[in-house]
Amino acid sequence: MSAPLSLQTLVKKTVASTSCLSIDEHILKYCDLWWHDAPLKLYMDRGRIQIKSGFLGEDIDLCVALIIAVKENNYNLIKLFTELGANINYSLLSINTKHVRDLCRQLGAKETLEDYDIFCIFNKIMHNKTSGSVILCHEIFINNPNLENKFAAQLRRLIYKRLCGLIEIKETDELSELLVKYWYAKAVQYDYKDAICFLDEKYTDLNEWRLKCYLYYNKIYELHDIYHKEKIQIDVNEMLSLACIRDNNPLTIYYCYALGGNINQAMLTSVQYYNIGNIYFCIDLGGNAFEEGSAIARQKGYNFLSHSLVLNIYSSDASLPLNLKDPEEISSLLKNYKSKNLSIILDYSHNIL
């Protein structure tokens, strides 16, 4: 059972939880309820205390707020957040002075934070799909001397799993570099424009990585801008392969094919990753690497796919123009497009079952 709140903390909690907007700024500052140039507000969300403040303009979990307060050496907020129920052990992730370490010990912090706990914090922050979550993760985790090697190994596995095919991870890679690439990819995936600007300002060597992320996440407008306006380019067949690594990417596949990419190579890449939507879209565009694709599928153990690729039932979709290069025209063309050849194999499968 948690200890009862002190009278002082109870008053602060009451003030911070009120919806009244007329409380004087000086009173809030006196009560340590003014943070990042804005009133600090508390509210409950599914049984957990959330903090509203000026930090990134977003709501944050109480335990995450504690990590930030520790990083800022804000003694009063460390005490307040801990008494309100934040896990004081989370403070170990951002302690940077002896005085704060001593304070956290007095409040009950352990000597070390378990790797599992660090991993949970990382996932807790990234679960909130906002620009602020990316920026917040960067501020807490980048070049953090408190991270243990075991956690670094867990994080490498997570990044490899979530960016499968987009990124190659070697044991010699710097964790900070992998983290930046992971955050940038998530920012592109979910259109976190503020996070992209934040990372672009801090890191000047991400242009090629940005191009690859646009291909991977089917972002045709952004791809067009970076390729034609900013002139950031790589080999068109490499671009097409990147577009095929993640399934259901018709926009960027078509775009790269229209630039001159090899559609048979794209088809084989799609087979390798078992991306069914991409395979049959490549056939719609004229791909005909059936024998080679069947062999790759057989080697991978994709037996039905191997069999289906050598059926003499496919042909390119004559309704698809193959020379569009304007992203708006391509988007309009494919907005409600249903793959001709995917429909053929689905009908075939239905009939034999």
UniProtKB/Swiss-Prot annotation:
Superkingdom as given in the UniProt entry: Viruses
A Pfam match: ASFV_360
GO BP annotations, alphabetical order: taxis
Family indicated by similarity: Belongs to the asfivirus MGF 360 family.
Function text: Plays a role in virus cell tropism, and may be required for efficient virus replication in macrophages.
Protein name in UniProt: Protein MGF 360-13L
Lineage: Viruses, Varidnaviria, Bamfordvirae, Nucleocytoviricota, Pokkesviricetes
